[in-house]
C-alpha cells in the first residue's frame, strides 16, 4: 500500500509534466494575460521523471530486503561518499572538467551546490540528507537514555548544525531548513524534554523578532531577504524594494502561481485543454500551481491527501518498529516529507517565501526522485525487518 501511494504520486507527476510540456509546445501555449507564446514543449522532463520513478521503485524494493541496521553500520562509507561530493562545491564554482561541471548554478540564485554531467544535474546534499538521517538515528539510538543531559544534547546539536552550516555556506538555505526540521522531528521522537523544546522556540522567536526590528536594514539586500519581505508586505507599502522593477521581479513568480491556482476553480481547466497561465518553474518548485490550474481544488485535495497518507504511513511504520533505531529513521524521513510538502505548498500559496524547496514526487528532477525512493526503501526495510506489522 505504501509503495502504491508513492507510485500514484509519481504517475500524477508524469501526467502533470506531460501536460505542461504539451501546453508549452502547442498552439495553446499563449499566456492569458500577455497574449504571448511562452515556450517550447519539453517532454524530456516527463520521460526522465517516469524513468527515475521506475528505477526508484526497483531500488526501493531492493532496499526493503536489506536490513536497515546493516546500512547504519556502514555509516563511514556513505558519510565519506556523500559529503565527499558536497564539500568541493563549497570552494569550486562552475568549474568544468570534461563533461562534468562542479559547483554548477542551476538557477538565478547564489546556490552553487550542484553537479552537472552532460544534460543531467545532481545535488549531492539530497544524497547526504539520507546519510544524515542514518547517522543521526544511530547517534540518537546510542545516547537516548542520556538524551536530556546537556553534554549529550550538545553533541547532538553539533551533529545537526555542522551539516546545516555547510549547506548554508553553499547558499541553499531551503535545504538547510529542511535538515533542521528533520533533526527536530528525530529529537522529538527520541523524547527530547519539553523544557528544551519550549526554550528553543522562545529563543528562535525572540532572535527573529530582534533581527527584524534592529538589523533589517543591515541583514542584506539579496533576493532571499526580499522574498521574505514580499510575503510580509506584498504591496511594498513599507518601501522594502529599492525599485518597482525589483518589487515586480520578486513577487512575479508567486503572483503568477496564485493566479494559476485560482483560475482552476473547483475542477480545473484540464491537463490537456482549457486556459493556461504561465508560471516560472511550473515544472519544478511551482508544479503545485500547475496542478491547481489543471485539476482545480479537487485535484489539489487528492494530491495533498495522498501525500498526507504517505507521511502518516511513514510515521506509523516508525511507531510500530521494535527498536528505536527504526523509529528514528522513519521519524527523519517522515519529517523530510512533511517539511518539503508544507514549505513547497506554502510557497505556491504565497504564505511562505520562495526558498527553492521542491514538492516530493511531483517536482521535475530524476536524481531527486531517486533519492525519494531510497527513503521509501528505508521505510519499507524498517517495516519488513520487524515482526510487528503496521496497523496490526
Where do the protein language model's features map onto the residues?
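Interfacial segments of multi-pass membrane proteins
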Residues: 140, 177, 182-196, 272-299, ...
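Hydrophobic, glycine- and aromatic-enriched re-entrant/interface helices and adjoining loop segments
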Residues: 99, 105-114, 199-302, 324-326
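Transmembrane alpha-helix boundary/anchor motif
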Residues: 58, 66, 135, 209, ...
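Hydrophobic alpha-helical segments of polytopic membrane proteins
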Residues: 54, 74-83, 150-168, 173-216, ...
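Membrane-helix boundary/helix-loop-helix interface segments in multi-pass membrane proteins
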Residues: 1-5, 11-12, 16-170, 335, ...
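Alpha-helical transmembrane segments of multi-pass membrane proteins, especially transporters
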Residues: 151-156, 200, 231, 277, ...
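Loop-to-helix entry and N-terminal half of a specific, functionally important transmembrane alpha helix
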Residues: 317-356
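Hydrophobic alpha-helical transmembrane segments
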Residues: 50-59, 128-129, 294-314
Amino acid at each position: 500500500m505504501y509503495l502504491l501511494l508513492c507510485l500514484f504520486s509519481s504517475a500524477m507527476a508524469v501526467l502533470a509534466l506531460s501536460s505542461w510540456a504539451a501546453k508549452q509546445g502547442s498552439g495553446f501555449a499563449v499566456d492569458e494575460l500577455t497574449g504571448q507564446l511562452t515556450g517550447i514543449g519539453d517532454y524530456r522532463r516527463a520521460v526522465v521523471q517516469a524513468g527515475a520513478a521506475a528505477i526508484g521503485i526497483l531500488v526501493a524494493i531492493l532496499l526493503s530486503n536489506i536490513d536497515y541496521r546493516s546500512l547504519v553500520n556502514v555509516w563511514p562509507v556513505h558519510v565519506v561518499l556523500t559529503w565527499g561530493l558536497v564539500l568541493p562545491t563549497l570552494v569550486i564554482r562552475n568549474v568544468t572538467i570534461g563533461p562534468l561541471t562542479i559547483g554548477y548554478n542551476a538557477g538565478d540564485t547564489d546556490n552553487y551546490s550542484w553537479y552537472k554531467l552532460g544534460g543531467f544535474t545532481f545535488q549531492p546534499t539530497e544524497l547526504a540528507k539520507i546519510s544524515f538521517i542514518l547517522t543521526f538515528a544511530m547517534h540518537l539510538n546510542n545516547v537516548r537514555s542520556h538524551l536530556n543531559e546537556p553534554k549529550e544534547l550538545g553533541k547532538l546539536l553539533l551533529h545537526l548544525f555542522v551539516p546545516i552550516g555547510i549547506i548554508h555556506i553553499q547558499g541553499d538555505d531551503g535545504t538547510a531548513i529542511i535538515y533542521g526540521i528533520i533533526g527536530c522531528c528525530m529529537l522529538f521522537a527520541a523524547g527530547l524534554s519539553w523544557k528544551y523544546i519550549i526554550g528553543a522556540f522562545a529563543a528562535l522567536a525572540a532572535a527573529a523578532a530582534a533581527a527584524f526590528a534592529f538589523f533589517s536594514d543591515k541583514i542584506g539586500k539579496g533576493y532571499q531577504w526580499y522574498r521574505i519581505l514580499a510575503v510580509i508586505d506584498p504591496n511594498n507599502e513599507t518601501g522594502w524594494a529599492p525599485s518597482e522593477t525589483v518589487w515586480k521581479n520578486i513577487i512575479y513568480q508567486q503572483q503568477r502561481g496564485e493566479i494559476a491556482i485560482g483560475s482552476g476553480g473547483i475542477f480545473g481547466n484540464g491537463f490537456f485543454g482549457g486556459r493556461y497561465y504561465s508560471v516560472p518553474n511550473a515544472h519544478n518548485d511551482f508544479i503545485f500551481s500547475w496542478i491547481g490550474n489543471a485539476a482545480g481544488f479537487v485535484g489539489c485535495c487528492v494530491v495533498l491527501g495522498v501525500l498526507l497518507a504517505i507521511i502518516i504511513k511513514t510515521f506509523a511504520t516508525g511507531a510500530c518498529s521494535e527498536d528505536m533505531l527504526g523509529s528514528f529513521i522513519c521519524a527523519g524521513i517522515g519529517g523530510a516529507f512533511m517539511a518539503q510538502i508544507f514549505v513547497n505548498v506554502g510557497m505556491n500559496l504565497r504564505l511562505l517565501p520562495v526558498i527553492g524547496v521542491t514538492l516530493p514526487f511531483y517536482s521535475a528532477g530524476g536524481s531527486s526522485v531517486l533519492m525519494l525512493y531510497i527513503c521509501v526503501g528505508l521505510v519499507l526495510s524498517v517495516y519488513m525487518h520487524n515482526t510487528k506489522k503496521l496497523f496490526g
